Design a protein with these regions (language model features):
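Jelly-roll (double-stranded beta-helix
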Residues: 1-181
Length: 181
């Protein structure tokens, strides 16, 4: 069993499944589906000026492989946005500071953040040293972790164990998605 997480930054995706769920994932929305013991599911992009999003597949622990399937529609207005000097953080799953996202991950404790940093901004996040953490740079460029090299858009970076994640931008801003679990 797996969970699929479809996060749509911009666009429109029509979806449906064998449980009778259906609808549209729209700008800033997320669909969190647990396949578990089995579900038929389809997604079809709809005509829109720009389509930008991603899908993450989460492998369920052995003991949860055959849980009943379930579906959660997290519309963009249900995803809290934390605004700080130089940053805007969308909390899709898990916590950022005192702000909780609409899901924590039922089977795999998950943090999923949509982070936008202005030029010259810094971002720090305490992390679980046992978690796997990676980012995907959506737009712009920045420095992540202790890397000297600037990472630009359309790149993913996997990080080793640690107690804190750090990011900073130069003269350009950056938008990245952060996943930990």
């Amino acid at each position: 069993g797996i969970e699929t997480v479809t996060y749509l930054i911009e666009g429109d995706i029509e979806h449906g499944d064998s449980l009778g769920n259906g609808g549209h994932i729209l700008n800033g929305g997320c669909q969190w589906m647990t396949a578990g013991g089995g579900i038929l599911h389809q997604e079809m992009p709809q005509a829109s000026p720009r389509m930008l999003g991603l899908q993450l597949w989460i492998n369920l622990p052995c003991k949860d492989k055959f849980v009943p399937p379930q579906y959660r529609d997290l519309s963009g207005d249900r995803i809290p946005r934390v605004r700080e000097p130089g940053a805007c953080v969308g909390v899709i799953a898990g916590h950022y500071g005192k702000t909780a996202g609409p899901t924590q991950g039922d089977y795999v404790k998950t943090t999923m953040l949509d982070v936008a940093l202005e030029p010259g901004a810094r971002f720090r996040l305490p992390t679980d040293s046992g978690a796997t953490l990676f980012i995907y740079v959506v737009e712009g460029a920045g420095h992540f972790g202790d890397a000297d090299k600037e990472i630009a858009s359309h790149r993913a970076v996997l990080f080793g164990a640690g107690d804190e994640f750090a990011a900073q931008t130069g003269d350009k801003g950056v938008r990245f998605l952060l996943f930990a679990g």
